Amino acid sequence: MPAIAAGLAITFKHFKNLLLGRTKVTMQYPEQKWDSNLPDYYRGAPALVRDEDGRVRCVACQLCEFICPPRAIKIIPGEIPSTDRFAKVEKYPEAFDIDMIRCIFCGMCEEVCPEQAIFLRKDYAITGFTRAEMVHHKEKLLEIGGVMHGVVLKWNTKK
């Protein structure tokens, strides 16, 4: 009996706090969104970016593929033809796939990238009806990432 009374006391305390507005309530998702409340350190899904010339920044070094803990990234490197104006870069990704179901959004791929070609975006609604839709290919990753101008300072200079 004492356990039941203690449980009811806790329930009444929570109910009282709810009526007085002292507790947080679940956010009603479609109407309310976290977009304005996301912290600066939020890590979303990865995306590829292009440089100012429209070239894919990724040089297919495969560091992100090797460092990815769940092995969510798959890259097939290819040679750039010598007739191309960007032939000085020796490789480019023929295929670049990220399995968003396996990705744990740790940010290690972003940190290890020497070309600043992969960034974690700030969206949290990543959906799909099938497993195949959750594997983002190079074209989709580039569409999401867009163009990145200049060099981005990834480190906090205030510390």
Q: What are the residue ranges of the model-derived segments?
A:
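Non-ligating segments of multi-cofactor redox enzymes
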Residues: 1-102, 111, 115-159
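Conserved strand-turn element in the central/C-terminal portion of the radical SAM core barrel
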Residues: 106
